[in-house]
């Protein structure tokens, strides 16, 4: 069981490093955020089932709801930015630039 948690922690850290490395493109950042949320969901689900804390069984579903909202808003922002500027660079999201 410890190797599963280790793999999930590595997946989370790789996705976090992907956010830090590929922060210039919005699509890459969104994919890395989805990887982080997926690893958190699986880790939370395994922890709840392993320790039999069924009073917290709704927490992974709430995390999935927030993840879906984040993905929807992120994709809407990606479409709006790519239509307005022709690319998906994060620097186009700065409102101070004209």
From Swiss-Prot:
One of its GO terms (cellular component) is mitochondrial inner membrane. It is found in: Mitochondrion inner membrane. InterPro entries: NADH_UbQ_OxRdtase_chain4L/K, NUOK/Mnh_C1-like. GO terms for biological process: ATP synthesis coupled electron transport. It catalyses: a ubiquinone + NADH + 5 H(+)(in) = a ubiquinol + NAD(+) + 4 H(+)(out). Its EC number is 7.1.1.2. Coiled coil: none annotated. Its main location: mitochondrion. It is a multi-pass membrane protein. GO terms for molecular function: NADH dehydrogenase (ubiquinone) activity. Keywords: Electron transport, Membrane, Mitochondrion, Mitochondrion inner membrane, NAD, Respiratory chain, Translocase, Transmembrane, Transmembrane helix, Transport, Ubiquinone. The chain crosses the membrane at residues 1-21, 26-46, 59-79. PANTHER family: NADH-UBIQUINONE OXIDOREDUCTASE CHAIN 4L (PTHR11434:SF0), NADH-UBIQUINONE OXIDOREDUCTASE SUBUNIT ND4L (PTHR11434). Core subunit of respiratory chain NADH dehydrogenase (Complex I) which is composed of 45 different subunits. Core subunit of the mitochondrial membrane respiratory chain NADH dehydrogenase (Complex I) which catalyzes electron transfer from NADH through the respiratory chain, using ubiquinone as an electron acceptor. Part of the enzyme membrane arm which is embedded in the lipid bilayer and involved in proton translocation. Belongs to the complex I subunit 4L family. This is NADH-ubiquinone oxidoreductase chain 4L. It comes from Caenolestes fuliginosus. The lineage of its organism: Eukaryota, Metazoa, Chordata, Craniata, Vertebrata. The gene is MT-ND4L.
